[in-house]
């Protein structure tokens, strides 16, 4: 039987918008990969997508049981868009060190909030 660890997060889109407007490229480069930035910045309103990816990274880190910090950094968790569901890319060392076989992620947003739920399969 395969074990699963879950993580969830919710964030106000306005909070991410304010952080991006205040810190601009420095904040984007600290949190988001180049591919994530390219995807979000193509959109008319990028803030909900940035917030959903931020929540996704938090949810993944919680599911991994590490949080963001020493074991895994913001940009180690890359969330890319695919037709069926978001794809989570992690460094191979993370899978090996934590004994994770796969990470599944669901992200969503409303007008005010972005939310995410991650499942890490062991």
Curated annotation (Swiss-Prot):
Its EC number is 2.7.8.7. Keywords: Cytoplasm, Fatty acid biosynthesis, Fatty acid metabolism, Lipid biosynthesis, Lipid metabolism, Magnesium, Metal-binding, Transferase. Gene3D superfamilies: 4'-phosphopantetheinyl transferase domain. It catalyses: apo-[ACP] + CoA = holo-[ACP] + adenosine 3',5'-bisphosphate + H(+). It comes from Chlamydia felis (strain Fe/C-56). It is found in: Cytoplasm. Mg(2+) binds at residues 9, 58. Transmembrane segments: none annotated. One of its GO terms (molecular function) is holo-[acyl-carrier-protein] synthase activity. Belongs to the P-Pant transferase superfamily. AcpS family. Pfam families: ACPS. Its cofactor is Mg(2+). The keyword Cell inner membrane does not apply. InterPro entries: 4-PPantetheinyl_Trfase_dom, 4-PPantetheinyl_Trfase_dom_sf, ACPS, Ppantetheine-prot_Trfase_dom. Transfers the 4'-phosphopantetheine moiety from coenzyme A to a Ser of acyl-carrier-protein. The gene is acpS. One of its GO terms (cellular component) is cytoplasm. One of its GO terms (biological process) is fatty acid biosynthetic process. This is Holo-[acyl-carrier-protein] synthase.
């Amino acid at each position: 039987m395969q074990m699963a660890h879950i993580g969830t997060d919710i964030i106000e889109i306005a909070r991410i918008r304010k952080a991006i407007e205040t810190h601009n490229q420095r904040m984007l480069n600290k949190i988001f990969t180049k591919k994530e930035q390219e995807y979000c910045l193509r959109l008319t309103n990028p803030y909900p997508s940035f917030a959903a990816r931020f929540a996704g990274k938090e949810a993944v880190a919680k599911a991994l049981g590490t949080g963001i910090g020493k074991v895994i950094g913001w940009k180690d968790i890359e969330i890319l868009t695919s037709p069926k569901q978001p794809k989570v890319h992690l460094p191979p060392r993370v899978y090996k060190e934590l004994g994770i076989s796969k990470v599944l992620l669901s992200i969503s947003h409303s007008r005010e909030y972005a939310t995410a739920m991650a499942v890490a399969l062991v």
